[in-house]
Amino acid sequence: MVPQALLFVPLLVFPLCFGKFPIYTIPDKLGPWSPIDIHHLSCPNNLVVEDEGCTNLSGFSYMELKVGYISAIKMNGFTCTGVVTEAETYTNFVGYVTTTFKRKHFRPTPDACRAAYNWKMAGDPRYEESLHNPYPDYHWLRTVKTTKESLVIISPSVADLDPYDRSLHSRVFPGGNCSGVAVSSTYCSTNHDYTIWMPENPRLGMSCDIFTNSRGKRASKGSETCGFVDERGLYKSLKGACKLKLCGVLGLRLMDGTWVAMQTSNETKWCPPGQLVNLHDFRSDEIEHLVVEELVKKREECLDALESIMTTKSVSFRRLSHLRKLVPGFGKAYTIFNKTLMEADAHYKSVRTWNEIIPSKGCLRVGGRCHPHVNGVFFNGIILGPDGNVLIPEMQSSLLQQHMELLVSSVIPLMHPLADPSTVFKNGDEAEDFVEVHLPDVHERISGVDLGLPNWGKYVLLSAGALTALMLIIFLMTCWRRVNRSEPTQHNLRGTGREVSVTPQSGKIISSWESYKSGGETGL
């Protein structure tokens, strides 16, 4: 993080940044001097604009930071994780089913995440049903895979919103920040590819509820706006203001560090990068009310001094000090040279420390150089003492100094990294600790016949089956050949039995048993 001291550098570089709440005011532009009568003396109205003759006051509305607005704007969101739950079943030969669940991840789409979040927030039973594992299917001797693509919604997941560039800061984001949330892109990537972060409210601008409408008086000269009197009665000049967006709302950062949004035709430059604004809290409001009361009191003291001058017809350096303008801007300076009352137009600037205007003994710095004195007299009651030191009759009230210190300390840091360790994701595959399944459609895939063997076992089984088939073929072929040999042998044996010749004892050849029988009978 940026060191807190560095955040104040822009305010310390420019003395005018402390604007309406200095410890003292002194002209940075002065002259020329001209003699006047005591009837030309007047008290400055520090609550009404006197810049460049802008005296036309009219009521108007403007927007400022809410009272009680804190530096870290919390934005509620949720994380959406894509999960694929796979149920794998195998049914063996005897019908025994084995089920194995596996879990993988995928990157979800923002639209699907928003729909799932709405389901969860509305209490839709479909979200509760989606938390179950997929119901597995099974087939005999086959491996069946049933998958569910689920969306896991975890809420709340709080991020810090930077009002300057509308970036988000949390440890769940890569590098701790996300600057891509806009109308066209309503999600942030996280430290895991399968998880995205989305704001609970799809309209990001509604989450930046830090503004309030106020009423005041606009000070203008023609079409040019010089400044305005705020709702608490304190005048704020637009001189030196710059344009600055907070939460996408265009406004003006004034020289005192406050931020307002108001319509003006003035040409205004953009603020430099890294420019900060002051917070608006109850304490600053209370002090500003006290400042207004103090300025009113100072004006009453000035009027009393002016009345004393008119009554006694005499002027002193102490009384002239009451006529000094107490806030930066255009006004008058008064002095007495050679018993003559003198007046000069002046533009006052704020002073933070006395060393700024009294850098050394006897030197009153005005406009960057030591201002000459006339017989030990400067202006506005400032004189040179007998010892050669510059004597200033009074200084601003302690309330103004207190308010100035408050404005210096109340700035919005540029970065607001979330320090809540409960939302830090773990490395590796440990993200499954927070995964709860959200169920979309079911997809089934049925494999071929599977005996449940590993790859090497399948090859052994195929080899054994091929060998067995080969042996069976050889056996069948052998049997077939034996059958073919036995049939011709039996046929030949039957033919020989009918044609065989028998030789009797008499030596006569008998062709057959029948011939032998008939011959024997005849002989007999």
From Swiss-Prot:
Disulfide bonds join 43-302, 54-226, 80-113, 178-188, 208-247, 242-271, 363-370. Changing residue 289 to P: Complete loss of RABV-G-mediated cell-cell fusion. One of its GO terms (biological process) is fusion of virus membrane with host endosome membrane. It is a single-pass type I membrane protein. GO terms for cellular component: membrane; viral envelope; viral membrane; virion membrane. Its main location: virion. The keyword DNA-binding does not apply. Pfam families: PH_Rhabdo_glycop (PF24834), Rhabdo_glycop_CD (PF24833), Rhabdo_glycop_FD (PF00974). SUPFAM superfamilies: Viral glycoprotein ectodomain-like. Residues 1-19 form the signal peptide. Residues 20-459 are virion surface. Glycans are attached at residues 56, 266, 338. Primary surface antigen capable of inducing and reacting with virus-neutralizing antibodies. Almost all human and veterinary vaccines are based on the functional aspects of the G protein. A lipid is attached at residue 479 (S-palmitoyl cysteine). Residues 481-524 are intravirion. Belongs to the lyssavirus glycoprotein family. Homotrimer. Interacts with matrix protein. Interacts with host TRFC. Interacts with host BST2; this interaction inhibits viral budding by tethering new virions to the cell surface. Interacts with host ITGB1. Interacts with host GRM2. This is Glycoprotein. It comes from Rabies virus (strain Pasteur vaccins / PV). The gene is G.
